Amino acid sequence: MSQVRRVEALAHTIRTWEPMLIPGLLQTESYARQVFRGRPGVTAEEVENAVRFRMHRQAVLSRPRPPMYSALIDESVLRRPVGGRELMREHLAKLLEVLNPPYLTVRIVPLSAGLTTGCLGAFEVATLRDCGPDHAYLESAEEGRVTNRAQTVQALIVRWEALSSMAYPVDKSRDLIHEVMKSYG
């Protein structure tokens, strides 16, 4: 099991910020496949391995006693047609299906927020169930890495809170996701 899967398996709470894509734990298989196909020089086998790994990670949200999962997503993510209009319509419909406040919430940071601290990149912060320090997962174009370095984790929590203060409430975010989904036809 990878380090990120181990941390997510022990998590009581997961907070994530995503400025470019739907968060990995909420991606459909088709959406994830499009994301991984976008990497230059990647083979079909590497794409399928990455998709399988991503789908296995998602099991954490459907286990008995899943973590509280709160995602903040930049509005531009909804409007970026990954894989085309039909795939985005299907993906946003699936996203609306899985929302389950208060256990699984998505809030949208509107474009009107302008340049935010979130433009520095995607991240996830996991608070573990009575078994150690908080951990962060930082994803780059090449790889993801997990850290429990207190200074890094605390800085990401502050960034998440700042972004959260700019995000629409859950109901308004759901309405926006639905509106954008309909715009895809």
Where are these regions (language model features)?
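Interdomain hinge/linker segments and adjacent boundary elements that couple functional modules
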Residues: 1-80, 148, 158, 162-185
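C-terminal regulatory/effector modules of DNA-binding transcriptional regulators
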Residues: 84-185
